[in-house]
Amino acid sequence: MHFTVCDFLLDLVQNSVEAGAKAVAVEVIEDGSWLAAEVTDDGKGMGPDELERAKDPFYTDGVKHARRKVGLGIPFLLQALEQAGGDYELRSERGKGTVFRFRFPAEGVDTPPLGDLPGFWLSACCFDGDYELLMKRRDASRGVAYELRRSELLEAVGELNDAGALVLAEAFLRSQEELGDEDEENERRA
């Protein structure tokens, strides 16, 4: 089930990795008016017909998931955007990759919460495959802004296949979100 924006983002990153992307970029922006995100990849891309079918919950190519009869990730996201009054842009070109940009009204009653962003970053780094993940974050209201790369995280903590490395990676990712909160607290004290 998709309860948060991070759930939708994880589906999109998984799609990118499974489409053979070597480079995936995810940007999450909160500016007070909108909760926006963009996922860009250099995977196999889709032609116009495939792009339309990707929006259909009753379509799956049968290749990625041989036993699955439906593909719900993108259709669920589109439904959530429609309900909340959000908008999106989905572009793809065969052999070049895909760009999925979307935004929800920040104060919309039907806007899903962002969710656990550091947990999402960690999960997105753990997919099998040789890919670079660029993680970009801006939250104007909290003064948080950072950019991270999967390769840098792996270089710092090692492969993400043991508990120690996962704990270190998660602590580091959470610290990036807390930096803005610390700055805000210091300003209040001054």
Predicted regions: what is each one?
Residues 29-37:
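Short beta-strand-loop-beta element adjacent to the nucleotide/active-site pocket used for signaling
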Residues 60-69:
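Activation segment
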Residues 76-86:
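Conserved glycine-/histidine-rich ATP-lid loop and adjacent helix of the Bergerat-fold HATPase_c
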Residues 41:
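Acidic ATP/Mg2+-coordinating residue in the GHKL
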Residues 90-94:
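A short beta-strand-to-loop motif within the catalytic HATPase_c
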Residues 96-98:
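Glycine-rich GHKL/ HATPase_c ATP-binding element in histidine kinases
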Residues 46-58:
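Short conserved segment of the HATPase_c
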Residues 22-29:
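A conserved short beta-strand within the histidine kinase catalytic ATPase domain
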